[in-house]
Amino acid sequence: MLLIRSKINITNLSFHRLLKPRALLLLAASSLLLGSFNAAHGTETGSNARSISNTTTTLPEQQATDIKNLPIVWVNVAKGELKVFGTLEDGTRNALFATKVSIGRNGSGKTRSGDQKTPVGIYKTEKFIERKDLPKRYGNGAFTLNYPNQYDKILDRTGDGIWIHGRPSEKEDAPYLDTKGCVDMDDENLNKLREFIQPKGTTVIISEEFEPTSLGPNQTAIIQRIQNWSNAWVSLDHESYMDFYDKSFFNGSRNYSDWDNYKGRINAFKSFINIQLSDFEILNYPEEEDLIWVSFQQSYASSNYNWEGRKITLWKKDNRHRWKIVFEGNE
């Protein structure tokens, strides 16, 4: 599995489109309808966006700078093992911590509520709940995970309450298949785990294979593809921009046709777009063929709206072996 945890800056600033007088009038008249942005979903809805100045700069070459030394958690459900990995200067992963864990009584591959399986996918820690706020069966506390994630929801996977937690002393040597879907370990190792990861925002990979030891061979190809996508976006060439989206695209509310119409409509009223992408995290999605999960920080500004936040895209190879977007949304 490819793993990239790096700070890669892709900056596209002010590709201006000349608008005819009538289009300029439409832009002004439409500002009340198309001038603001719903930051939670990335959709323009109102009239309180801030205007920014029209500046033009050249597009710099993409550069990979400092690799972010942010630990990730990997749960190998086939072996009942959890590891925490750090990153060396050359991008190689090294194990910082390892422990045996128990998973769902019915194994892995959760698809529905109550199936007592542990999900497979890429998740984030949301918070840590202390022992005093939990029943005894959770031991010294629990990290909550964001299952179901965006991809799970697209696949109609149900259920919730998937945690990484401790266990009471009388169950210190619990069997491999023992939980209702959570990942659990003895309290001593849970306390050690807390020393390495953050309560919120730590990446947790749950899979049957994969050990993240290197950046992998696809780094250059996928980063170049992302840069080409951002180039098409800021150019305001709608046809070129949509060519980066697969016909199977779905973001939970819009399919490919809906997205095509939506983006074409809102971008028609823009005179320029500025984009800066940075702090990439790139992973092959567990147990999926040719599906890459890309998370990054996005700073976006246009002639009628500004937004900054973290975004997720899922890229899949089409029948011509080109990486195309099948999902886009906010993290």
What are these regions (language model features)?
Residues H238, M242-R254:
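Short, solvent-exposed secondary-structure junction/capping segments
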Residues A23-G35:
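Bacterial N-terminal signal peptides
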Residues M1-L18:
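N-terminal secretory signal peptides that target proteins for export/translocation
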Residues W307-E331:
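Short beta-strand edge/turn micro-motifs at domain boundaries
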Residues D115-V120, I129-Q227:
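Exported/periplasmic cell-wall-interacting domains
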Residues K117, G264-I312:
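Surface-exposed, charged secondary-structure patches
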Residues T55-P71, V101-G114, Y123-F128:
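N-terminal post-signal-peptidase region of extra-cytosolic proteins
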